[in-house]
Amino acid sequence: MVLSPADKTNVKTAWGKVGGHGGEYGAEALERMFLSFPTTKTYFPHFDLSHGSAQVKGHGKKVADALTLAAAHVDDMPSALSALSDLHAHKLRVDPVNFKLLSHCLLVTLAAHHPAEFTPAVHASLDKFLASVSTVLTSKYR
């Protein structure tokens, strides 16, 4: 999915507001996903999935850091996320639908924390951005 210049600006501005809360928001989005879509828990059999778990917080930070990297390299996400794409395709073998589920939960989390800034235009831009990240992460599945 091609991001317009306005989309790129919206993504960088919105993700910039996440600031030091990336790990917190990532963990919250994961918790939302586990509660709303319980089948996603199967990819984390070794995790303590309880609220506030250090493992969920740690993985939430990894998710946020990957999205920060993608936002910083929005014009070349395939190169920036290549190692992560390899990991998910060849080692973790995550079902691609799970990226869509997590993306939805990330949007809900961002909207809950930044309602004034979460305009329809920002929502659409973030949705396109997350769809692009998902496409990159699943590009090596073949």
From Swiss-Prot:
Heterotetramer of two alpha chains and two beta chains. Belongs to the globin family. It comes from Piliocolobus badius (Western red colobus). The modification N6-succinyllysine is found at K8, K12, K17, K41. The modification Phosphoserine is found at S4, S36, S50, S103, S125, S132, S139. One of its GO terms (molecular function) is haptoglobin binding. Red blood cells. This is Hemoglobin subunit alpha. Signal peptide: none annotated. O2 binds at H59. The lineage of its organism: Eukaryota, Metazoa, Chordata, Craniata, Vertebrata. The gene is HBA.
